[in-house]
Amino acid sequence: MSEVVRRALFLAPGLALASAVSAQTPVARAVMVSTWDFGRVANAAGIEVRRARGSALDMVEAGGRVIESDPDNTSVGVGGYPDRDGRVTLDACVMNWNGDIGAVCALEDIAHPVSVARAVMEKTPHTMLVGEGARRFALDQAFETAVMPSPSAEAAWREWLKTSTYAPVSNRENTEWRSMPGGPGNHDTIGLLAIGLDGHMAGACTTSGLAFKMRGRVGDSPIIGAGLFVDDEVGAATATGVGEDVVRVAGSHAVVEAIRQGKSPTEACRSVIERLARLRGTAVADHQVAFWPCRNRGNGAAGRSSPVSPSP
């Protein structure tokens, strides 16, 4: 194993889980998982929807909406940092158990892109709308608007303008692998996976993308197969980190397919991260990518790459 690959591998702790299911038994209750510490709030919203007889798709949408509404979250929704031109552009996608998908990219002025993505899936013959077309569709469907950037996000952008150094980095959960997650800045994209009481799965991703990105940049989050993939026969996966790297290996799809081939969720994460490290070598030595798979029986794992290797 090369040094780049060796340094890339270890399990990540940042998984928020809400369930009452053993990892070794068939699903008996609804399950919901999402990324990072703030995912606990999303999970609580999803489980509340489930109590009202909501589906897995209802659960992940509800969880995503809660995070999109948080003005203190700088990488999702109304609190998201703007691009280099000072404009907040939002990306989201949803995928249902039967292969139905919907996505929006570079959406502006709309409070809940995850709900717009669902509407694209359910109310149009298309799978993705972008830019002004996505915004026009959202307004036609009477989705709630929002003023963005927030005052704090605009202040951060104006501070960035003083140097305008174009080196956007993901709002990744940790720079040092030993740092425990928990601070409000220790996060990025939220990915959500759920299993309803009917046993069917669904997933969602929502993000404002890289802070101070080039205008028009889209990462992995709204791309089905990269930031999210759901297959009722096997399981589902979501991703976070440097989106360009996730897209290069169709990361979430690759993780699910590795599980289909017999790997455990942990082994599946490892195999895709190893593949990325072999493919890109030193180009990804300072990058972070993370995957969160969940099998259709409810058991899952989390794995990520990191530029810092844990001690032997």
Predicted regions and their residues:
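Generic hydrophobic alpha-helical segments
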Residues: 16-17, 70
